[in-house]
Regions:
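Acidic/His- and Gly-rich active-site-bordering loop/insert found
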Residues: 2-110
């Protein structure tokens, strides 16, 4: 099924696990941490000609990106987070986003992904 580019963009983000381990050792390694998701976002930002780097904890990095606009006098700061809460209680596959009755379901779909 074909979706609008913005919906597919969000589906691609949801499909990348970025679970905050919250100090727990029972979170599977393939979903714990934000590194894969941060790398994906960084590459998308670079594709938009922004300078983007990962900083901080290698497994739970932050992204710092900067765009210079000729003649601009104002600064815009966008602050968000990359992690999601654990998926223990989800009844659907949290990283296989589905659309049902016009709503998108998946971990992070109603947060900052």
């Amino acid at each position: 099924m074909s979706h609008r580019p913005s919906v597919q963009f969000l589906r691609d983000y949801i499909a990348i696990p970025s679970v905050n381990p919250m100090g727990r050792d029972d979170i599977p390694a393939d979903v714990a941490g934000e590194r894969r998701y941060a790398e994906h976002v960084r590459e998308q930002l670079r594709g938009l000609s922004l300078d983007a780097e990962l900083v901080g904890d290698p497994e739970r990095p932050s992204i710092v990106a900067e765009a210079s606009v000729a003649g601009a006098t104002d600064t815009l700061l966008v602050a968000s987070h990359l992690d999601t809460v654990p998926v223990d209680t989800m009844e659907i596959d949290p990283f296989d986003p589905v659309i049902e009755d016009g709503r998108l379901y998946g971990r992070g779909s109603c947060d900052t992904k």
